[in-house]
Regions:
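Phosphate-binding site recognition
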Residues: 1-228
Length: 228
């Protein structure tokens, strides 16, 4: 997928890279509906940052498997080489030792899958932040598509309440970006496609800019198997 616009979002995240208050360590939450481009944004920003970065996406699986895969990512080893951790607290302790004082980005995507597998994950992460990460050079970013669950993380009842140093709710792409995707389409066609796909990057990418809007509707929308 080509990277288009997101200037405000990139400005926010780039500011995070150099912010010294409340400290060099930063704890950011990014959320938004599915397919709005959260993962693509974070991967692009992390790659362009020029510093070490780790991306991990939680899956619908057991907590021990999630912990093992996360540590493998952070420690740059295979899952088979990664030890088993009995708890999230044990895992975060190990990750804190691996990271140390090195400046780096750690992205935890689809976080609700991890908390669904073991609700204790959040309190363990809160403890790790308080005891280790907030005193480090780490930029920790958590991300998720379950908007209500992600908003709950910011409530007073959440273990993570008061820990976030920044938050961003990612919106669909604005209308003007459609001209970049479809430079040869008329304004009317771009208005029409906006009403159909709603500025969602993943859906925009399904459309062929070399074909007319009508042709795209016939191929991609009336015959949804074409998008599978």
């Amino acid at each position: 997928m080509n990277f288009v616009d997101r200037k405000a979002e990139l400005s926010f995240f780039n500011h995070i890279l150099h912010r010294e208050h409340p400290g060099p360590a930063q704890f950011i939450i990014l959320y938004g509906r599915r397919r709005v481009g959260k993962t693509h944004l974070l991967r692009h920003w992390a790659k362009e940052s020029g510093i070490k970065h780790t991306y991990w996406a939680a899956e619908k699986e057991s907590a021990p498997n999630q912990r093992r895969k996360l540590f493998a990512k952070v420690d740059n080893r295979t899952v088979a080489q990664s030890p088993l951790f009995n708890s999230w607290a044990e895992l975060w302790e190990a990750i804190a030792q691996v990271i140390g004082q090195e400046r780096q980005i750690l992205i935890l995507d689809e976080l609700p899958y991890a908390t669904d597998g073991d609700p204790a994950m959040l309190s363990a992460l809160q403890h790790a932040w308080d005891q280790h990460f907030q005193h480090s050079q780490l930029i920790l970013v958590i991300c998720g598509s379950q908007v209500q669950s992600m908003e709950t993380l910011q409530h007073r009842q959440s273990p993570l309440f008061g820990r976030f140093t920044g938050q961003w709710f990612l919106q669909p792409l604005p209308f003007h970006t459609l001209k970049t995707f479809f430079p040869n389409w008329s304004a009317a066609e771009r208005v029409a496609v906006r009403s159909i796909v709603g500025g969602i990057p993943a859906y925009i990418q399904w459309l062929d800019p070399t074909k007319s809007l009508v042709e795209n509707i016939q191929k991609q929308i009336l015959f949804p198997e074409a998008c599978s």
